[in-house]
């Protein structure tokens, strides 16, 4: 007899209704709820899955390299990075007519292709790759690594090679290895690659395995390192006239602190980047030897945390209990990891355009826009996930005795103050920002645009001036040539930095005005409201005045019946659900702002943003509507063009998004009645009633239907905005 799905839960497998399938899918990854799951087995399964995850990532990157080498135009692109469009892969589609084949045949090849907007060409070029053979070698290497990781994942599930629970909870050893190995040694290896391969390649010197050991990356070799004369490595850097990829204007320095950008590529100096990674390596390798393991020397994490008790008693027991709490809670660990990675991903989005590290990418506007949008959306998902697992921690793992009067307990005790302050900030930001926008709309609508309320963002301008931007005339710190900050760094990195920050050729500290001030506060509203919902969801996850026993109902529950009718929508899951909508809206405001600002800056018409961004109709008309032209006209009665695929995606993105509302607005009873009516009709329809099913059809629960609605809303949201960003930018600058 075949075992019914799901195998991990006998109770669900024996459920006679279709909820068996839906609850099975819903709890497939809730490993700790599975039958017979022990703590040790849980850790082992998660550990093994990490290898599978890494294998998938490396297989995917191997596929990128392979398809570009096979179907792309990397070697042609290398010869002219500013003019040749980089190809991701070829397209074969039976729907393509002659006009489509013609429209999608570009990039100097004779077959239809997709253009790459991920920046991989710029990355591979910058790190020293030049030929398709290089790409094939990379693809093969990653394929081998992927296979090795898959084997390692399988191996660590075998009884002999399963680590024990003590190994997983050995925090100091894990921290040492991750700091030294993961961050330190990998940074050292990367700086080594830059020094030995990428920097010589940028100077026209081809280094591969055949001459790797016989070619010195610096004329003095290791002598300056062993004699302590490290400054030699910074002498004779590339000149401002250096032609990237050639020896013309090239220097010999390998570790510099020039600041600013390479004039031709508009990317950071490779020698600065190598220096950065070497410094990171030293710091992290040192940090990875600080924690106590085998020899009883170094820091004990528990001792450090237990000692963190402020003397005046304002934080009670301080960090006591946190070591045990974090060690024993995977949800707490995951929450902290997701929050850290979320912040890092958002920072990547900000830095990739402001301080581009890849040659010529600053001039590939479509790639710049795609990468910014991509990283900000991912950051949003990671941050919401962090709070979701924080809430699950409070429901499942939080022990009041272990955490008695420590910072966690005091967060729970002060939750009313925390939540009400966040609420006040959100209300203040919302009413004032919207009030200003609407006032300005009224003024423009009634023919008195000069009466708009326009605030100059003086504090932000002051910060820009402190970093060296001279335009505002503040004459402070780095924008003052006589300040201590300027004098201290004037001989090192400051000349390059000052040239960059005051140049109109990059996105470093863009000039800001009233439109930026308003949208900044609109984004602040979104961030604070999302945070309010998530923080409230986590802090109220164990219980509230309305429902003190909430933790007994678990992370997600629809309602606690008619007896306590006010208990709908108050589970921690509901907070996550609501926060997702706010997160998506906030990230869209962030990306709208970034994209519109850059479209006008790149087009040499910054005034268009400055004039139209101070009122809401300006955003709707001059950003969204005006830039949707390539999407609306990708295909029409007269034919199609290369934007047709984005136009089509823009359309079906809207449709998926709209489908979400069907599940979000109609609730369970409607679906149950509909299903029962359909079953009645099916059973009375000749021929159709020959088909029977074992499970009794039952509508999705409220929580599940909301998840289906949210999934459609989210996927549709992204499939609408992604093609908008790519097609509208391509339409202007391709």
UniProtKB/Swiss-Prot annotation:
Chlorophyll a B3 binds at residues 662, 670. Gene3D superfamilies: Photosystem I PsaA/PsaB (1.20.1130.10). It is a multi-pass membrane protein. GO terms for biological process: photosynthesis. Its EC number is 1.97.1.12. Pfam families: PsaA_PsaB. One of its GO terms (molecular function) is electron transfer activity. Keywords: 4Fe-4S, Chlorophyll, Chloroplast, Chromophore, Electron transport, Iron, Iron-sulfur, Magnesium, Membrane, Metal-binding, Oxidoreductase, Photosynthesis, Photosystem I, Plastid, Thylakoid, Transmembrane, Transmembrane helix, Transport. It is found in: Plastid, Chloroplast thylakoid membrane. Chlorophyll a B1 binds at residue 654. Its main location: plastid. It is an enzyme of class 1 (oxidoreductase). PsaA and PsaB bind P700, the primary electron donor of photosystem I (PSI), as well as the electron acceptors A0, A1 and FX. PSI is a plastocyanin/cytochrome c6-ferredoxin oxidoreductase, converting photonic excitation into a charge separation, which transfers an electron from the donor P700 chlorophyll pair to the spectroscopically characterized acceptors A0, A1, FX, FA and FB in turn. Oxidized P700 is reduced on the lumenal side of the thylakoid membrane by plastocyanin or cytochrome c6. This is Photosystem I P700 chlorophyll a apoprotein A2. It comes from Emiliania huxleyi (Coccolithophore). The lineage of its organism: Eukaryota, Haptista, Haptophyta, Prymnesiophyceae, Isochrysidales. The gene is psaB.
């Amino acid at each position: 007899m075949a075992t019914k799905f799901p195998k991990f839960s006998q109770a669900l497998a024996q459920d006679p209704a279709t909820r068996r399938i839906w609850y099975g899918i819903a709890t497939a990854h809730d490993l700790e709820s599975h039958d017979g799951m022990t703590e040790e087995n849980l850790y082992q399964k998660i550990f093994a899955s990490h290898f599978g995850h890494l294998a998938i990532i490396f297989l995917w990157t191997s596929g990128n390299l392979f398809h570009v080498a096979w179907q792309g135009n990397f070697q042609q692109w290398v010869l002219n990075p500013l003019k040749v469009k980089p190809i991701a892969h070829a397209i074969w589609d039976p729907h393509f007519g002659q006009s489509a084949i013609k429209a999608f045949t570009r990039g100097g090849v004779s077959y239809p292709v997709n253009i790459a907007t991920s920046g991989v060409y710029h990355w591979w070029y910058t790190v020293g790759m030049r030929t398709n053979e290089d790409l094939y070698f990379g693809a093969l290497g990653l394929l081998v690594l992927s296979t090795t990781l898959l084997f390692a994942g399988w191996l660590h599930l075998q009884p002999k090679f399963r680590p024990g629970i003590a190994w997983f909870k050995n925090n100091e050893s894990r921290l040492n290895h991750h700091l030294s190995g993961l961050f330190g040694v990998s940074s050292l290896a990367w700086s080594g690659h830059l020094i030995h391969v990428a920097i010589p390649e940028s100077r026209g010197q081809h280094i591969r395995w055949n001459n790797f050991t016989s070619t010195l990356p610096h004329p003095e070799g290791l002598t300056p390192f062993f004699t302590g004369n490290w400054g030699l490595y910074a002498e004779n850097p590339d000149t401002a006239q250096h032609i990237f990829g050639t020896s013309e204007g090239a220097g010999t320095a390998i570790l510099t602190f020039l600041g600013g950008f390479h004039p031709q590529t508009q990317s950071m100096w490779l020698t600065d980047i190598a220096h950065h990674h070497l410094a990171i390596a030293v710091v992290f390798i040192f940090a990875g030897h600080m924690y106590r393991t085998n020899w009883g020397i170094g820091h004990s994490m528990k001792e450090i945390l237990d000692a963190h008790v402020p003397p005046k008693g304002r934080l009670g027991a301080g960090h006591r209990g946190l070591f045990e709490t974090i060690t024993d809670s995977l949800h707490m660990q995951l929450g902290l990891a997701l929050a850290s990675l979320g912040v890092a991903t958002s920072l990547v989005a900000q830095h990739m355009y402001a301080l581009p590290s890849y040659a010529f990418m600053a001039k590939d506007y479509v790639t710049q826009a795609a990468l910014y949008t991509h990283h900000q959306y991912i950051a949003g998902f990671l941050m919401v996930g962090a709070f979701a697992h924080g809430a699950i921690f409070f429901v499942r793992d939080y022990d009041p005795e272990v955490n008695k009067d420590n910072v966690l307990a005091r967060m729970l005790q002060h939750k009313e103050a925390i939540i009400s302050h966040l609420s006040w900030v959100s209300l203040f930001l919302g009413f004032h920002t919207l009030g200003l926008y609407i006032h300005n709309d009224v003024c423009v609508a009634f023919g008195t645009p000069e009466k708009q309320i326009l605030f100059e963002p003086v504090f932000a301008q002051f910060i820009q001036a402190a970093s060296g931007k001279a335009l505002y005339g503040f004459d402070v710190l780095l924008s003052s040539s006589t300040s201590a900050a300027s004098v201290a760094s004037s001989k090192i990195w400051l000349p390059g930095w000052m040239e960059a920050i005051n140049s109109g050729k990059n996105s470093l500290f863009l000039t800001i005005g009233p439109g930026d001030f308003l949208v900044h506060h609109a984004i602040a509203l979104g961030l604070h409201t999302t945070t309010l919902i998530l923080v409230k969801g986590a802090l109220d996850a164990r219980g509230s005045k309305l429902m003190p026993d909430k933790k007994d109902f678990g992370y997600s529950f629809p309602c606690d019946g008619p007896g306590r009718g006010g208990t709908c929508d108050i589970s921690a899951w509901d907070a996550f659900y609501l926060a997702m909508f706010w997160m998506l809206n906030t990230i869209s405001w962030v990306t709208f702002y970034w994209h519109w600002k850059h479209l006008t800056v790149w087009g040499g018409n910054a005034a268009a943003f400055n004039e139209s961004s101070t009122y809401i109709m300006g955003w709707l008309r001059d950003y969204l509507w005006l830039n949707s032209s390539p999407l609306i006209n990708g295909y029409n009665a007269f034919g199609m063009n290369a934007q047709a695929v984005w136009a089509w995606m823009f359309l079906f993105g809207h449709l998926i998004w709209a489908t979400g509302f069907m599940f979000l607005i109609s609730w369970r009873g409607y679906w149950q009645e509909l299903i029962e009516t359909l079953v009645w009709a099916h059973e009375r329809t000749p021929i159709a009633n020959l088909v029977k099913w074992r499970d009794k059809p039952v509508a999705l629960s409220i929580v599940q239907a909301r998840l289906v609605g949210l999934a459609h809303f989210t996927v549709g949201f992204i499939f609408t905005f992604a093609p908008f960003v790519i097609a509208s930018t391509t339409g202007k600058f391709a």
